[in-house]
Amino acid sequence: MVVTLDGEILQPGMPLLHADDLAAVRGDGVFETLLVRDGRACLVEAHLQRLTQSARLMDLPEPDLPRWRRAVEVATQRWVASTADEGALRLIYSRGREGGSAPTAYVMVSPVPARVIGARRDGVSAITLDRGLPADGGDAMPWLIASAKTLSYAVNMAVLRHAARQGAGDVIFVSTDGYVLEGPRSTVVIATDGDQGGGNPCLLTPPPWYPILRGTTQQALFEVARAKGYDCDYRALRVADLFDSQGIWLVSSMTLAARVHTLDGRRLPRTPIAEVFAELVDAAIVSDR
């Protein structure tokens, strides 16, 4: 199902994009993906803020947020009326037609992929791969727009296919100078011993000034976890820190929390906080309600 910013509902099979839309021919646009759970879209404002930031980095017109909110509401209501299942709600915003036009903007909802359900339940195996950027690449090379969520996902998809050929289900990118960055569709979060020893572990993720996308789910997770007494921080991490941690998760708005059970072919010990971590993420995803 597709909803335009005018509130028009398009059924599957109805034409939407022109053949020369820059979303299709260049990947020239931005997007967001939200989870629909328990009758509502999750973390809507956080995703709209990131959509706005991505549009700004891409020199796209400022998104009309009231119209986006209304389209999200209409799409969510229609989805919830038709099924009790979770939904994957996407916000698509492209530069428009190649010959010049207003931007293309719409919301679409589809079923949550089976892959996502499996990753939540069983975790994933992952491999580390060089991203080809230093940890300071975002500042040194701003034209790479590493902190924008763009439609240009060819590299992300290619790296996941490469991982599959190696027998892995996901990837953790590492900078050329050896620092952990992110997954191709997720934020890396690890649990370590707290600074005081004993008690709750500390949750860590790479610094947001790295050439990575800031995670909406990770930020909500840190807010919820801090309120429950967990230390949460942004820290430079090496691959060795992943192996030394109490647990590694790939966190995202759709998969939520995929525990990494195998890294670079090495089976990791079962983390004692696996269930608690999943509960924290479940609470975080609805923390704006």
UniProtKB/Swiss-Prot annotation:
Gene3D superfamilies: 3.30.470.10, D-amino Acid Aminotransferase, subunit A, domain 2 (3.20.10.10). The modification N6-(pyridoxal phosphate)lysine is found at residue 149. Keywords: Aminotransferase, Cell shape, Folate biosynthesis, Lyase, Peptidoglycan synthesis, Pyridoxal phosphate, Transferase. It comes from the Bacteria. Pfam families: Aminotran_4. The record marks 26 as: Important for dual ACDL/DAAT activities. 2-oxoglutarate binds at residues 252, 254-255. Homodimer. Bifunctional enzyme that catalyzes two enzymatic reactions in biochemically unrelated pathways: acts as an aminodeoxychorismate (ADC) lyase (ADCL) in folate biosynthesis, converting 4-amino-4-deoxychorismate (ADC) to 4-aminobenzoate (PABA), and as a D-amino acid transaminase (DAAT) in peptidoglycan (PG) biosynthesis. DAAT activity is strictly restricted to D-alanine and D-glutamate. May function as a metabolic toggle that alternates between ADCL and DAAT activity, prioritizing the former over the latter in response to substrate accumulation. Belongs to the class-IV pyridoxal-phosphate-dependent aminotransferase family. This is Bifunctional aminodeoxychorismate lyase / D-amino acid transaminase. The lineage of its organism: Bacteria, Bacillati, Actinomycetota, Actinomycetes, Mycobacteriales.
